[in-house]
């Protein structure tokens, strides 16, 4: 994630990653300066973004409209050589059934095999009880799973691993399913230094 004040630091961030042997794995949303730098340094990070929740008379029409809205970014990420991760962030667009439907639509109708799903536990508190079923549905399309401590009702929403009631079982479910893709830890706490937050996980 980033804010306007971080834009001037984009290039230095890339240089520091290179200096310390770190992969620039993913970038949130779209920014022209970032995309220019990706081309300059020949980087191909995953691009994570949400699709809209359009109003339509049928589920099929909503899926098609959501997919159509993503087409400029679908084409741009393909040219960049980057995977595009549809990001669950609540609402209709954050439901696994809809993430899969939009992903399938883009792959089948627009040859967008680089499009997949980024599933965030911290936006999935409503999926705790049926996580195994939903993981199976999403698994063929997953680009990354981001972990989080998980309590009922998102109390609190952001929680270090090992401090919640449900994340151990959810991680066991991920292992049992044979998921072998990237696993992420996000630092979403403004009150804690990033190094401290990541080490806690």
Model-based region annotation:
Residues 31-117, 123-126:
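Active-site acidic/histidine proton-transfer and metal-coordination neighborhood
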Residues 3-6, 31, 59, 92, ...:
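Alpha-helix N-cap/loop-to-helix initiation residues
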Residues 1, 22-28, 43-49, 84-86, ...:
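Hydrophobic faces of well-ordered beta-strands that scaffold small-molecule active sites
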Residues 1-44, 68, 108-114, 139-140, ...:
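N-terminal pre-domain/capping segments
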Residues 9, 13-16, 37-38, 51-64, ...:
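Surface-exposed, active-site-proximal loop segments in enzymatic domains
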């Amino acid at each position: 994630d980033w804010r306007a004040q971080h834009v001037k630091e984009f290039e230095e961030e890339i240089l520091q990653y290179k200096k310390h042997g770190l992969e620039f794995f993913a970038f949130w949303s779209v920014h022209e300066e970032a995309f220019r730098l990706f081309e300059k340094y020949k980087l191909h990070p995953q691009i994570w973004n949400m699709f809209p929740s359009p109003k339509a008379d049928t589920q099929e029409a909503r899926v098609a409209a959501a997919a159509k809205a993503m087409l400029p970014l679908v084409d741009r990420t393909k040219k960049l050589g980057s995977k595009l991760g549809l990001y669950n962030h609540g609402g209709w667009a954050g439901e696994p059934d809809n993430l899969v439907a939009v992903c399938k639509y883009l792959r089948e109708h627009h040859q967008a095999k680089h499009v997949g799903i980024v599933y965030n536990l911290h936006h999935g508190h409503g999926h705790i009880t049926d996580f195994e079923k939903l993981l199976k549905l999403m698994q063929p399309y997953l680009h990354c799973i981001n972990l989080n401590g998980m309590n009922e009702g998102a109390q609190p929403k952001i929680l270090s691993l090992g401090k919640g009631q449900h994340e151990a079982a959810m991680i066991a479910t991920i292992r049992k399913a044979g998921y072998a893709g990237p696993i992420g830890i996000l630092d979403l706490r403004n009150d804690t230094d990033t190094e401290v937050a990541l080490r806690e996980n």
